[in-house]
């Protein structure tokens, strides 16, 4: 199953996340199919960028979004 979720990058105590499309069996930071955005929780205001066109495409072909990505996509 294909899922849209966050992958953590950045360094210790300085998280930065990519919004990626990946197979549900992969590890959190394992290989991904496509990166469609990012989320920076440390900036003020929190910086969220998601490519809506690609998000809608992947939802259309059956990808499920994680709860956090659903909340972030409403803010973007």
Curated annotation (Swiss-Prot):
Keywords: Ribonucleoprotein, Ribosomal protein
GO cellular component: cytoplasm; small ribosomal subunit
Record PROSITE patterns: RIBOSOMAL_S16
GO biological process entries: translation
Top-level taxon: Bacteria
Pfam families reported in the protein's UniProt record: Ribosomal_S16
GO molecular function, one term: structural constituent of ribosome
Record carries keyword Ribonucleoprotein: yes
Keyword Plastid: no
NCBIfam families (UniProt xref): S16
PANTHER family: 30S RIBOSOMAL PROTEIN S16, SMALL RIBOSOMAL SUBUNIT PROTEIN BS16M
Sequence similarity: Belongs to the bacterial ribosomal protein bS16 family.
HAMAP family: Ribosomal_bS16
Protein name per UniProt: Small ribosomal subunit protein bS16
Species annotation: Helicobacter pylori (strain J99 / ATCC 700824)
């Amino acid at each position: 199953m294909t899922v849209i979720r966050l992958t953590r990058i950045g360094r210790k105590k300085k998280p930065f996340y990519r919004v990626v499309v990946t197979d549900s069996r992969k590890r959190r930071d394992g290989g991904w199919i496509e990166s469609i955005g990012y989320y920076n929780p440390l900036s003020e205001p929190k910086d969220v960028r998601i490519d809506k066109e690609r998000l809608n495409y992947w939802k259309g072909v059956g990808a499920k979004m994680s709860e956090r990505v659903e909340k972030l996509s409403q803010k973007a």
